[in-house]
From Swiss-Prot:
Position of sequence motif Unconventional nuclear localization signal: 1-18
Record gene name: NP
GO biological process, one term: symbiont entry into host cell
Binding partners and assembly: Homomultimerizes to form the nucleocapsid. May bind host exportin-1/XPO1. Binds to viral genomic RNA. Protein-RNA contacts are mediated by a combination of electrostatic interactions between positively charged residues and the phosphate backbone and planar interactions between aromatic side chains and bases.
The species this protein was found in: Influenza A virus (strain A/USSR/90/1977 H1N1)
Keywords annotated in UniProt: Capsid protein, Helical capsid protein, Host nucleus, Host-virus interaction, Ribonucleoprotein, RNA-binding, Viral nucleoprotein, Viral penetration into host nucleus, Virion, Virus entry into host cell
Protein name: Nucleoprotein
Family: Belongs to the influenza viruses nucleoprotein family.
Motif Bipartite nuclear localization signal: positions: 198-216
Length: 498
């Protein structure tokens, strides 16, 4: 990749850093984790939570959401200008769960946003510590990616539900910065751009005037982010066309959908980071571990090691399976919603099963759910091996297509052969071949047609024993690759036949 030199590593994005060496990056990421941990400890004290209650993932989510809401400047400004009945724009809160007389009780807490901001800054040496906020946003995004398949959002914009593997980060807020942009999938960027273009079609003033100029800058920036995710010259050239369009309209939407489809084979590079809930960092800091001093990385062994020794609990509804709830959270912690189930199973050391076979709903509990029957259990978040998180999307070399797996965007840098039914995808490319992008389209289609599934199309490293911190002895697992190991589609394989 020619532009590799100008790219910053995730950790730099994560910490808004200038060029830093590995040790400095590890320290600044560690500092960010320390801040989240200290904040969480302080919030547990404020809320008078017991150790067990502080390790409850539902309480963690509420506390994380409170601080994100306290720092959401745009929304805060909007709320103050458009007061709605019964909502105090200066306050934030949510459900906190406590154990009372052997039962779980829900208690709604309310805090001044100013107070939450003070506690957060105090935990972060007086800084706003945006990197820590983004980190929590990415954890929420990874949890959403694991819990929900964005079928409706895809269909509404004219994309195919099978493209769900391109939708990483689709629930990340716009304000999530460079670190957020790095983890967004190709489909997520395409969706954002299509929504923008549609607004422009329906509202003549969208691109006009002073506001329109800002809109245009945002549009071009999003185009450049998406372009940076593509790894072939033709895909990038098409993105230039979309970006330079005088008046973006249906032709651009068509081009974007074409590009999204092409990304099923010519995979984009999308970052994966292991972002853990605050209730993991808090107890670690409380036990005296100094993340900044020890150094920490979101893409190496560190999150695995941290999860090996963490106790996290979750509320469980009467008919939910605690092991399934654990799998859901394990996948979210490892950013593995779009990874091949066989790779995940090997790393985890227990079978990871498709979403449709999980007897569990989301982690959050709705306000109208009955607490009387609510139980709780320990989440099993440990792993048998660890592996490096990848950013490559699984292509061997940038200029030649290699068979990317249809419903998978690799998370772990682990070598695997790919099963791959090209005809299914190629069928999506019949139709419009004329227009200004025809030569690029033709080139992209040619690259896809020449993609040979028998190549080992994901040249990764392998997995490592948890004792192998330096990643010295890769173990390359052999997988039975006769079928797709897709999380969202694994339970209805006949979808591939029709």
């Amino acid at each position: 990749m020619a532009s590799q030199g100008t790219k910053r590593s995730y950790e730099q994005m994560e910490t808004d850093g200038e060029r830093q060496n590995a040790t400095e990056i590890r320290a600044s990421v560690g500092k960010m984790i320390d801040g989240i941990g200290r904040f969480y400890i302080q919030m547990c004290t404020e809320l008078k939570l017991s150790d067990y209650e502080g390790r409850l993932i539902q309480n963690s989510l509420t506390i994380e959401r409170m601080v994100l809401s306290a720092f959401d400047e745009r929304r805060n400004k909007y709320l103050e200008e458009h007061p709605s009945a019964g909502k105090d724009p200066k306050k934030t809160g949510g459900p906190i769960y406590k154990r009372v007389d052997g039962k779980w009780m829900r208690e709604l807490v309310l805090y001044d946003k100013e107070e939450i901001r003070r506690i957060w800054r105090q935990a972060n040496n007086g800084d706003d510590a945006t990197a820590g906020l983004t980190h929590m946003m990415i954890w929420h995004s990874n949890l959403n990616d694991t819990t929900y398949q964005r079928t409706r959002a895809l269909v509404r914009t004219g994309m195919d539900p099978r493209m769900c593997s391109l939708m990483q980060g689709s629930t990340l807020p716009r304000r999530s910065g460079a670190a957020g942009a790095a983890v967004k999938g190709v489909g997520t960027m395409v969706l954002e751009l299509i929504r923008m273009i549609k607004r422009g079609i329906n509202d003549r003033n969208f691109w006009r005037g002073e506001n329109g100029r800002k809109t245009r800058i945002a549009y071009e920036r999003m185009c450049n982010i998406l372009k940076g995710k593509f790894q072939t010259a033709a895909q990038r050239a098409m993105m230039d066309q979309v970006r330079e369009s005088r008046n973006p309209g249906n032709a651009e939407i068509e081009d974007l959908i074409f590009l999204a489809r092409s990304a099923l084979i010519l995979r984009g590079s999308v970052a994966h980071k292991s972002c853990l809930p605050a209730c993991v960092y808090g107890p670690a800091v409380a036990s005296g571990y100094e993340f900044e001093k020890e150094g920490y990385s979101l893409v190496g062994i560190d999150p695995f090691k941290l999860l090996q020794t963490s106790q996290v609990y979750s509320l469980i509804r009467p008919n939910e399976n605690p092991a399934h709830k654990s799998q859901l959270v394990w996948m979210a912690c490892n950013s593995a919603a779009f990874e091949d189930l066989r790779v995940s199973s090997f790393i985890r050391g227990t079978k990871v099963i498709p979403r449709g076979k999980l007897s569990t709903r989301g982690v959050q509990i709705a306000s109208n759910e009955n607490m009387d029957t609510m139980g709780s259990s320990t989440l099993e978040l440990r792993s048998r091996y660890w592996a490096i998180r990848t950013r490559s999307g699984g292509n061997t070399n940038q200029q030649r297509a290699s068979a990317g797996q249809i419903s998978i965007q690799p998370t772990f840098s682990v070598q695997r052969n790919l099963p791959f039914d090209k005809t299914t995808i190629m069928a999506a490319f019949t139709g419009n071949a004329e227009g200004r992008t025809s030569d690029m389209r033709a080139e992209i289609i040619k690259m896809m047609e020449s993609a040979r599934p028998e190549e080992v199309s994901f040249q990764g490293r392998g997995v490592f024993e948890l004792s192998d911190e330096r990643a010295a002895n890769p173990i390359v697992p052999s997988f039975d690759m006769s079928n797709e190991g897709s999380y969202f589609f694994g339970d209805n394989a006949e979808e591939y036949d029709n």
